[in-house]
């Protein structure tokens, strides 16, 4: 109980007095990484997948697009994520998905959840393979723990890329809330992913992150959609 009380007091101390007004996040320097979470009603999973595939294929032709991938959550096929990289802020802002949102509105179970990031610990962008296990994790810590968490995530990414079966391991930092991160992992198969979970550096990371976490460690598994 005392640990959580100290955590709450630390968060409160980090909030400036009179900080009710929010300022827009600064423009991202370099590539813009976007993770968009989409959820449709369970009975419309196939329709949602078809619309999202059309959107993905069309967006790949847009100027400045460097990645446009579509994945479907394992065990919950009505939930999807779109993973994109745009060359720069201008290319991202010129890209529009209003038409997609209008088409999905009749079947959506929740509003789109867009997470816009800069690349924090990114390496080669391996192509998404059909057999891959895709893992998306949202890491949230209070602002005073941001820098410590960045160091932990960088260490984790470096160690994880050396594991057998790893095809991608990147950390993205949210532009509007720099104490929030998205971790994108690609593993050759479930066996490789399970080995990663059991690895010493992974468990050490979770042990150190736990006391600093501002929310549940949100890790979800997906399959690629062609």
Regions found by a protein language model. Give the residues of each.
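Short, well-ordered beta-strand segments in beta-rich or mixed alpha/beta enzyme
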Residues: 31-38, 69-96, 132-140, 170-197
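Glycine-rich beta-strand-turn "strand-cap" elements at beta-sheet edges
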Residues: 22-30, 69-78, 102-134, 138, ...
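N-terminal secretory signal peptides that target proteins for export/translocation
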Residues: 1-4
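Bacterial N-terminal signal peptides
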Residues: 6-17
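Sec/Tat-exported extracytoplasmic proteins
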Residues: 55-63, 96, 108-111, 164, ...
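Short amphipathic alpha-helical segments
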Residues: 42-65, 100-104, 145-168, 201-205
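Short helix C-cap/helix-to-loop transition motifs enriched in small/turn-promoting residues
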Residues: 61-64, 89-92, 101-105, 110-113
């Amino acid at each position: 109980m005392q640990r959580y009380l100290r955590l709450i007091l630390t968060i409160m101390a980090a909030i400036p007095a009179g900080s009710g007004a929010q300022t827009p996040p600064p423009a991202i320097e370099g590539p813009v990484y976007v993770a968009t979470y989409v959820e449709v009603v369970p009975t419309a999973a196939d329709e949602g997948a078809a619309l999202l595939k059309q959107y993905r294929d069309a967006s790949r032709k847009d100027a400045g697009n460097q990645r446009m991938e579509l994945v479907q959550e394992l065990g919950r096929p009505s939930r999807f994520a779109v993973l994109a990289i745009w060359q720069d802020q201008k290319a991202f802002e010129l890209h529009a998905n209003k038409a997609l949102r209008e088409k999905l509105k009749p079947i959506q179970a929740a509003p789109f959840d867009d997470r816009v990031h800069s690349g924090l610990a990114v390496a080669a962008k391996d192509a998404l393979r059909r057999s891959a296990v895709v893992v998306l994790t949202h890491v949230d810590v209070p602002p005073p723990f941001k820098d410590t968490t960045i160091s932990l995530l960088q260490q984790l990414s470096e160690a994880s890329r050396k594991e057998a079966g790893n095809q991608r391991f990147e950390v993205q930092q949210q532009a509007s809330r720099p104490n929030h991160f998205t971790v994108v992992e690609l593993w050759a198969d479930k066996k490789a992913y399970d080995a990663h979970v059991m690895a010493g550096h992974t468990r050490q990371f979770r042990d150190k992150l736990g006391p600093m976490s501002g929310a549940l460690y949100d890790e979800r598994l997906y399959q690629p959609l062609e």
